[in-house]
Structure formats: structure tokens, C-alpha cells
């Protein structure tokens, strides 16, 4: 997708550059042609200004009267002199009609016909033929407006000024390349969904029973230690006794025995010089092997110790153990096994 976008941008940029080059060549060529056209017009304008200036000077100096006398003596010659002056006007105007709109401002000085009428005071009959050639001079001037072909002048508005928009291609700096930041889709791998597959927590339970002395008495430490060892417990971790899978203390621990008095530990030196109100036997479910069989073994060990020390077996609330409480323990064990199955 990015390659297609880049290719399209490159093609569009190339087309824009070519268009700008063609437009530049076309405008420069047009400017040159307009410059060559304007030069002859400027020359014609300067010549006409000079002619009009000479005519004005002659009129002010009274040269007009001399022309009137010449017309009286040789009217044919006067016409010949006037005709060639008119002919260049016809020659210059048609090819460069674009300059004709400026002539109306210069035409008033070309009306020498009026000063020629001044000699009428002395010879009223003779100036008339002199006015006749002056009229054709005005007629072509009136016909000159036919040259409104000057409409070609609107071509001049095609000036280099329109080239100023050329800097507009600057926006074509391919700023769209900025979307290169599209690597943003990387967040798609939302691995957080993995926690959705949370495994159900493993249900656990602790079965507790106690062996305690009768009310108001305590168990002798020496007798208690002997009975614990006979039940297959071995002293071990956390300074308490553990019943392992094998009576010799090998294999995983099935259940444990702790002192009922805080902190619940026994003396590591295993001396019998102590007494205690009782001991606590507990089993964590699930455990190694068959939990129901382990519970039966735990119950047998508690009864054996109680018989040896002259105590009684109590439940987790330190009440007399009853058949209903035993069934409750067994139901709890089965519930844990089924929930973890």
C-alpha cells in the first residue's frame, strides 16, 4: 500500500514539474514576442511626437501663412507636399494598429487646417482649395478608429506576474510522507487478552483435629514423644513432626503434628522435660495419594496417641469428635477433589 502511494505521489510530482516548465517556456516566449512588438510602436510614437512638435513650432512662427501663399501660386505643388505627409500616416497605422488608440490625444495638434483659414482675411476666395486637402487629412483620422483591432492589447495582461503562483508547487514537498508513522498499528498485538484464559484457582482445604488432656490436666512430654514416634511421625522441618508415606520417613509428607502451645514447635533436643495441654494434627487437601485414605490414617494416629497419653480426640473447634463431624470432614475432602478434577 505504501509503495502504491509513493508511486502515485512521484507521478503527480513529475506531472506538476513538467507543467511548470511548459508554462514557464510559454510565458517567456510570449513576453519576448510582446517586447518585439512594442519596440516599433515606441519608435513610431517618438517620430509622431517630433512631427507634431515641428508643426506646432511652425504654426507659432507664422509659417502657416507662407504655406498659404504657396498654395495660391501653385496649389498643385501644395497638394503634392501635403500628400506625402499623409501617406506615411496610412503606412504606419495599419501594421501597428495597436498604437492607434493613443493617437486621439495627438490628433488635436494635427488640425493645421484651422490655422490655414487665417489667410482668409486677405484672400477669402483662395483658402478654400487649401482646406480641401486638409479635409482628407481628417477623414483618415476619423477612419483610423476602425483600427480597434488594438484588442490584441489584452494579450499584454499575460505578464510574468501570473508566474508568482508558481511557488505553489512548494506544498508538493510530499508532506504526505509523514504518515510513515503508520507503525502505530503495532499496538494491535494486545497480548492482554491472554489473561482472559485465567485458570480457575485450585481449591484447597485443611483438615484439623486435636489430641488434648482432660480438663484441668496436661500431657507429659516424655510419654507424648514416645507415642508420637510409635505412630510413625518423624521430627523435621519447622521443628514439628511429619507423617510420611513410608514409616521410615521417606516420601512426601501426608500430614503433620504441632504443639498446641504457641509457637507450636518442639525442642530440637527432644528432651522429655516439658508438658503441654495437647497437640494438633492437620492435613492439607489436596495431598499426595488418596486424600480419604490419608484422612483415615490421620484419624488412627490421633486415636493411638490419645490412648497412649490418656487424652481425648477433639475437632477443629476443640469439641469432642463425633461421627457427624467425621462425615463433614470426608465431604469437604470429596468437594475439593471434585472441584480440582
UniProtKB/Swiss-Prot annotation:
TM annotation in the entry: 7-27
Ranges per topology, Cytoplasmic: 28-341
Skewed-composition ranges (Low complexity): 85-105, 113-156, 171-181
Entry's Gene Ontology cellular component terms: cell division site; plasma membrane
Biased composition (Pro residues): 157-170
Presence of the UniProt keyword Cell membrane in the record: yes
Pfam families given in the database record: ZipA_C
Keywords: Cell cycle, Cell division, Cell inner membrane, Cell membrane, Membrane, Transmembrane, Transmembrane helix
Gene3D superfamilies in the cross-refs: ZipA, C-terminal FtsZ-binding domain (3.30.1400.10)
Membrane topology (Periplasmic): 1-6
Record-stated family: Belongs to the ZipA family.
Its biological purpose: Essential cell division protein that stabilizes the FtsZ protofilaments by cross-linking them and that serves as a cytoplasmic membrane anchor for the Z ring. Also required for the recruitment to the septal ring of downstream cell division proteins.
Assembly: Interacts with FtsZ via their C-terminal domains.
HAMAP family from the UniProt entry: ZipA (MF_00509)
PANTHER family: CELL DIVISION PROTEIN ZIPA
Protein name, entry field: Cell division protein ZipA
Gene name in the database record: zipA
